[in-house]
């Protein structure tokens, strides 16, 4: 699989795509600078930045931001257990603020926080322009599907957003929540890995 940057600069006859590729690293820096300085939400919590290859074929929109190391470790483990090419992914949280109550306990993001962060999600999609999006968890899904849609009814479905093939799966936070309820999680973990593999296969088949 050739790198998109190489293909756009060396083998592309589309000047707009070449310009997008060349500007992508700058746009990633712009995104994180804007997020870090963002004061749209009254909470003004600490934030989680987007990272990865800004010219990736695969964009992963994760659940709302976290600073819990166990979550980060499981996410990395799932990537390692899949066939996904990790140099070809860009990862962005659906809500960048780490949402905590006044007592420092974690909470769900508010509708306003979700709405305020949507502009950053859309900006990310536009500058990465991936071949496929992986949406992990209900918060990510609500960035581009109305929030009255039931997540569990959509988790097995494929869709399109801005004309981009989009796969829906569970989030790492979902796995930990199911464990707290003493519910089995092997099938959910398998689903995430299968979705990662499906995204990579989709990219490979486009080559």
Name the predicted role of every residue range.
Residues 2-207:
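A polyanion-binding, active-site-adjacent surface
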